[in-house]
Design a protein with these regions (language model features):
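N-terminal targeting segments with Sec-dependent signals, encompassing both cleavable signal peptides
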Residues: 1-291
Length: 291
């Protein structure tokens, strides 16, 4: 009778060989997760640097950070699950077949999860490696104190702005199976030069719904209006390009215009001056991330 009990007991448990093989598979999964985590850390450092030197706008920066944080959280959760299963397999208690099959199922499912997550991380990698911006001095297209591009400079402006739209479209077309949310952002910057009383000050102040405004507020509004003008041209170019495409359903692009005012365009430059053409710029960015 005792012999029968022992036979039944052992037949309901998993062999040491199977446990050893599963522990090896789990170690391999943990290494893959560790490599993904290392890649996320590298991408995050790259993101921080691009943002600091003005090659990544605030909206894109926040969106990419959110994706990376989400993926890192997932890695930590999956690694924790793998560690718990490994501890169970390494314990003194014998593993029953039902418990082992549950571990097998979880580990098998992780293959598909890791594949999807790897694609997401690789997508961000490719996005960060793209040159997703173009900048130009405001004097190239705007008259002093002006925020409308003159008609005689409009064709030239479209030639300069078109590549940023084209590069976004090319990037999106590389990922036909993704439904992407994309953005084109025009950010205007100004130096700290003051304003003489006159019609420009009156117009900018009125635009802000005020009777008086500080120099900083005036520069912020002027930079916003210039960004708005650039954004309207970008939208025209974008709509023209989209008409030529067969699958327009893949494209969901928003346009943003932001006045940065006297904020420094490049946070790593420490010798900006009050009157400085390096600060009088408009920067156009694009981004595209999976929904």
């Amino acid at each position: 009778m005792a012999l029968i009990v022992i036979v039944v007991l052992f037949s309901s448990c998993v062999s040491n060989r199977k446990i050893s093989m599963m522990k090896k598979i789990i170690d391999e999964k943990k290494l893959i997760e560790k490599n993904l985590e290392t890649k996320i850390t590298t991408l995050n450092d790259f993101r921080i640097n691009k943002s600091a030197i003005g090659e990544l706008d605030d909206k894109s920066n926040e969106s990419i950070l959110k994706v990376l944080d989400t993926e890192k959280k997932g890695i930590l959760q999956r690694t924790d699950s793998l560690n718990k299963m490994e501890a169970m397999l390494s314990g003194d208690k014998r593993i029953k077949i039902k418990e082992f099959k549950n571990i097998e199922s979880i580990v098998a499912t992780s293959n598909d999860i890791i594949a999807v997550k790897s694609e997401s991380i690789n997508f961000v990698d490719q996005l960060l490696k793209q040159q997703t911006f173009v900048k130009f001095n405001t004097a190239a297209f705007f008259n002093a104190g002006g925020f409308k591009i003159p008609e005689d400079k409009m064709d030239e402006a479209k030639i300069v702005f078109s590549p940023i739209v084209d590069s976004l479209i090319v990037f999106i077309k590389k990922f036909p199976k993704y439904k992407l949310n994309s953005s084109i952002i025009a950010s205007g910057f100004a130096d700290a030069t003051g304003f003489s009383p006159g019609s420009l000050v009156d117009l900018l102040t009125s635009n802000m719904g005020k009777t008086e405004a500080t120099k900083e507020e005036l520069n912020s509004e002027l930079s916003r209006l210039r960004a708005e003008e650039v954004s309207s041209i970008l939208l025209t170019i974008y709509n023209e390009r989209i008409k030529e495409l067969a699958n327009t359903g893949q494209f969901n692009t928003q346009f943003f215009k932001i006045g940065k005012g006297e904020e420094f365009p490049n946070k790593k430059i420490d010798n900006y001056q009050t009157d400085d053409e390096r600060r009088r710029i408009v920067v156009i960015y694009w981004n595209a991330l999976p929904e």
